[in-house]
Amino acid sequence: MNNDMDKIFNPASGEAEEFINHQEILDTLQYASEHKNDRELIENLLEKAAKCGGLTHREAAVLLECDVPDLVDRIFHLAKEIKQRFYGNRIVMFAPLYLSNYCVNGCVYCPYHAKNKTIPRRKLTQEEIRREVVALQDMGHKRLALEAGEDPRNNPIEYILESIRTIYGIHHKNGAIRRVNVNIAATTVENYRRLKDAGIGTYILFQETYHKKHYEELHPRGPKSNYAYHTEAMDRAMEGGIDDVGIGVLFGLNLYRYDFVGLMMHAEHLEAKFGVGPHTISVPRICPADDISTEDFPDAISDEMFERIVAVIRIAVPYTGMIISTRESEAVRRRVLELGVSQISGGSRTSVGGYADSKPEHTEQFDVSDHRSLDEVVGWLLDLGHIPSFCTACYREGRTGDRFMSLLKAGQIANCCGPNALMTLQEYLEDYASPETRAKGQQEIAKALEHIPNPKIKAIATKCLEEIKQGKRDFRF
């Protein structure tokens, strides 16, 4: 009879319980606990990580457990250095777009669960999607993350594909959605191939928790209850031709140490099997919502530990983009932007139809902590010295998968991303920004131009910025 103890850890395996191996996680947690004050080991790990080659799951676990104050300070300092080296001061902007909250699953932490009779169910028509996208374009968004519950009857793959075509086809005034990322349930290789052919950017799927027994308790019914099928979804996505995948856990569902190690092992697995790790790692935390109370989840983590998790992920997986949601407050967002986060949402609505409707029904998936408009978030980022980026050039220029990662790991991606961020910010300032934000943005663009080291790239970027001011759009390196 097979059980967890029969499985042997193998990061290159295609079997969930081998590349996310329960016993290896337990052994790693014990090792980290035993070595959390081992100064020589931790200093060696920091020295290794400073070379930007990443760390193993076991090495990362030691840094997460470390409680020596001066070494913890060095962990945070190194995370900031690595973030700056790979991503500079650029922060990619996006917005979630909820298509439908119909769902057949029984996830006990999500208000969309099938037995919740208090939440109004809604699925957007293509005309309603058009209105949502126009509203998003009028804010200035260029990049969306599609969200939909799992319901084969109400939300079949054909509906998702039609919605993607609708979104890409809408050009309102100077607006355009240039990259559609998709966060939908685990599906088949063939369906991933169809999503690829539809032109999606990143396929995103949160594991929720890597602890198999706890996962099955949290997902008692519905297709998502199949742990292996869910955990192996990214393998099928990459087999279907999707180059960029995004992983994440919902911190607070389970012991954070366990899920942190599982997350690192998943990144190692993708690198071992496909030669390219996750394009993004998301770090959501459990939060209140309709029919859901955080009091039911005793493993919720503090802001301080959340910041540590972000810092160690940045050190251990230096190349990955990191995403934080509007679940987090302005204060938490400010801190983790320094430590590792490279993408945030702005002006987000987590309800179906929430952008076009002035008074949407109570269909939110979770409560939002940051209620600021996109313009307010952009202005805030500029005040902090960040460059808000609406760039989607890598996806449209074919710099995806291993091609993107090789450029990023070699430190060459900044030659594209830096000027592209400035040009897309200039577009935003011309078309959507308030006068106050426009003034801040022009000042930051002027400063950033002076720091472009390549004279040829600087000259081209300067010329393009002037042409954007004259009404031209969509320049990119």
Model features per residue range: what roles?
Residues 1-44, 48, 331-339, 348-477:
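Radical SAM enzyme core and accessory elements
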Residues 47, 51-91:
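An N-cap/entry alpha-helix motif that binds or orients negatively charged groups
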Residues 87-88, 92-128:
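Canonical Radical SAM [4Fe-4S] cluster-binding loop centered on the CxxxCxxC motif
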Residues 148, 202, 207, 228-292, ...:
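Conserved C-terminal portion of the radical SAM core fold
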Residues 218-224, 295-299, 363:
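Short glycine-enriched, charge-decorated loop/helix-capping segments at active-site entrances
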